[in-house]
């Protein structure tokens, strides 16, 4: 289950970064 928690955390972090940066600007 550790990998699931890590995946969720990564997704949340990614979403937070995307929200912080201008949408449509730099997309990874």
Curated annotation (Swiss-Prot):
Pfam families per UniProt: Leu_leader
Coiled-coil regions listed: none
TM helices/strands, residue ranges: none
GO biological process, one term: L-leucine biosynthetic process
Keyword field contains Signal: no
Alphabetically ordered keywords of this record: Amino-acid biosynthesis, Branched-chain amino acid biosynthesis, Leader peptide, Leucine biosynthesis
InterPro entries hit by this protein: Leu_leader
Functional note: Involved in control of the biosynthesis of leucine.
Protein's name according to its UniProt entry: leu operon leader peptide
Name of the coding gene: leuL
